[in-house]
UniProtKB/Swiss-Prot annotation:
This is UPF0391 membrane protein Pnap_0032. The keyword Transmembrane helix applies. The chain crosses the membrane at residues 5-25, 33-53. Belongs to the UPF0391 family. The keyword Transmembrane applies. It comes from Polaromonas naphthalenivorans (strain CJ2). Keywords: Cell membrane, Membrane, Transmembrane, Transmembrane helix. GO terms for cellular component: plasma membrane. It is a multi-pass membrane protein. It is found in: Cell membrane. InterPro entries: DUF1328. It comes from the Bacteria. Its main location: membrane.
Amino acid sequence: MIKYAIIFAVISLIAGALGFSGVAAGAAGIAKVLFGLFLILAVIFIVLAALGVGAAKKMMK
C-alpha cells in the first residue's frame, strides 16, 4: 500500500509542477476532449447493456 502512496505522491508532484507552468493550458484542453470522449463511450455502453446487446446478453442467458 505504501508503494501506491509513493507513486501517487510522485504523480501529484509532477502534476503540480506542470500546473504552475505553461503546459497546463494544453493539458487542460486534452483532458476536456478525453473526458467528453469517455463520457460518450460510457453512455453508449450503458445503453447497450440496458438493451441486452453483446456480452451482457450472453451473461443473462
